[in-house]
UniProtKB/Swiss-Prot annotation:
Coiled coil: none annotated. InterPro entries: TMEM82 (IPR031648). GO terms for cellular component: membrane. It comes from Mus musculus (Mouse). This is Transmembrane protein 82. The keyword Acetylation does not apply. Keywords: Membrane, Transmembrane, Transmembrane helix. The gene is Tmem82. Residues 331-356 are annotated as: Disordered. It comes from the Eukaryota.
Length: 356
C-alpha cells in the first residue's frame, strides 16, 4: 500500500543533531553554554566594579558598570544560546582548540610575576570559546547516555542557579558595595573587600579545568568522524599548520597593538577567515555555515563586554594589590587606631621642685 514518507525524510540533515529529540538536546547544550558565559561575565563585572570603587579616578566607569539593563542581558543570553545551538560540534571543537592553543602561547610568553592584565584580557575574549567548550563537553559526556535529555535538564537547572546567583551578586555589589564596605556590616562585601585580588587566580584555575575537559572532548568529537588514520592525518596536518600560523600572527599583533575592541574584531575576522579557508579544503559545506554562526557569536560576545574592554585599555588598571609595608605606612600616617586596641598611656608630667 502506498504511503507518504515522513516529514523528517524531506528535511535536510543539520550539523551535530538530528530532528526530534537531538534538536532539543542541542538547544539545552547551547543554553547551558550561554549560562556559563553569563556567570563568567557577571564575576568579571563584579571584579571590575570593585576595582573602580577603589580608584577615585574611575567614577565614570563605575557608573557605566552599575547601569543595569535586565532586558539587554536577557537578549544577550538568548542570542548567544541561538548561536551555540546552530554551530556544529565540529566547528565548536575547532574554536575551543584554537583558543586553548592561543591562551597557552600567551601565558608562556608572560614573565614571572607579571601579566595580570593579560590574564584579564584572556578572560574577556574567551567567552564564546567557553560556551563552545561547555557545549562540546556536554555532547561528549552525554553521548550514548540512555537518559540524555534528563541529564541535560538537570545540568540546565544547576546552570540556572549559578547564573541567577552570579547576577544577584552583581546587582548587590553594584548598588550596595560602597555603603556596606564603608560601614563593615555585610559579609559578602567584606569578603570581596578582603579577597578581591584573589578573584583572577580563582577564575584562572576554574577556566583551566573547564578548557582542559573541553579540549579532550573536542579531540574526541573530531576523531570520531574519521574512518581511518589516513583521513585523520589529512585533517590534522593542515589544521596544525594553520593554527601555528594563527598563533604566531596573534602574538605579533598583541605586542604591536594595544588591547581594544577594534583590534579584537580584527582578530576574530582573521581567526574565522583562517578556519574558513581550512575547512574549504578538508571540511564539509555545513562546516562553512557553522563558521558564519561562530563569527556572529564571537562578535555578539564582544558587543556585550564593551565596557570591560574599555577598562582594560586604561594604563595602570586594575590597581595592584598594596604591599604590607605600604599599608602599614599609610596606617601610621593617617594616625588611625582600632578603638578596641588599648592606647598607650601618656607619661605624667614631672613635678617641679618646691623650694623649702
Amino acid at each position: 500500500m502506498f504511503s507518504l514518507p515522513s516529514l523528517s525524510s524531506w528535511l535536510p540533515s543539520l550539523p551535530s543533531f538530528e530532528w526530534g529529540s537531538s534538536l532539543f538536546d542541542s538547544l539545552l547544550q547551547g543554553l547551558i553554554g550561554a549560562l556559563g558565559v553569563s556567570v563568567l561575565n557577571s564575576l568579571l563585572k563584579v571584579y571590575f566594579f570593585v576595582a573602580c570603587v577603589n580608584d577615585p579616578q574611575r567614577q565614570p566607569q563605575k557608573q557605566r558598570l552599575s547601569a543595569q539593563w535586565a532586558s539587554l542581558e536577557m537578549l544577550h543570553l538568548a542570542g548567544l544560546t541561538l548561536f551555540l545551538t546552530l554551530i556544529g560540534s565540529r566547528v565548536a571543537a575547532l574554536v575551543v582548540l584554537e583558543f586553548s592553543l592561543r591562551a597557552v602561547s600567551t601565558l608562556l610568553s608572560l614573565g614571572k610575576g607579571s601579566g595580570n592584565k593579560e590574564r584579564l584580557q584572556l578572560f574577556l575574549v574567551c567567552q564564546f570559546s567557553l560556551g563552545c567548550g561547555l557545549s562540546c563537553g556536554l555532547s561528549f559526556l552525554q553521548e550514548g547516555a540512555p537518559h540524555r535529555s534528563l541529564n541535560l535538564l538537570l545540568s540546565l537547572g544547576l546552570a540556572v542557579l549559578l547564573a541567577l546567583g552570579a547576577r544577584r551578586l552583581t546587582r548587590h555589589i553594584c548598588s550596595l558595595y560602597e555603603l556596606h564596605s564603608s560601614q563593615r556590616y555585610c559579609g559578602v562585601c567584606l569578603g570581596l573587600l578582603a579577597s578581591q585580588h584573589g578573584m583572577p587566580r580563582l577564575l584562572s584555575r576554574t577556566l583551566t579545568v573547564a578548557f582542559a575537559v573541553s579540549d579532550l572532548a573536542a579531540v574526541a568529537l573530531i576523531n570520531k568522524d574519521f574512518l581511518s588514520s589516513s583521513e585523520a592525518v589529512r585533517f590534522w596536518t593542515p589544521l596544525t599548520i594553520c593554527y601555528t600560523l594563527l598563533v604566531i600572527y596573534m602574538q605579533e599583533e598583541q605586542w604591536q597593538h594595544r588591547f581594544s575592541l577594534q583590534g579584537q574584531v580584527q582578530t576574530v575576522l582573521v581567526r574565522m577567515g583562517g578556519l574558513f579557508l581550512l575547512l574549504m579544503t578538508v571540511g564539509r559545506w555545513l562546516d562553512l555555515l557553522s563558521i558564519f554562526f561562530s563569527l556572529l557569536g564571537e562578535l555578539w560576545c564582544l558587543a556585550g563586554i564593551r565596557a570591560l574592554i574599555d577598562l582594560c585599555q586604561i594604563q595602570g588598571f586594575p590597581p595592584q594589590r598594596p604591599t604590607v609595608t605600604a599599608a602599614v605606612t599609610a596606617e601610621g600616617e593617617s594616625g588611625w587606631t582600632d578603638p578596641c586596641e588599648p592606647r598607650p598611656s601618656t607619661p605624667a608630667p614631672a613635678r617641679s621642685a618646691v623650694p623649702s
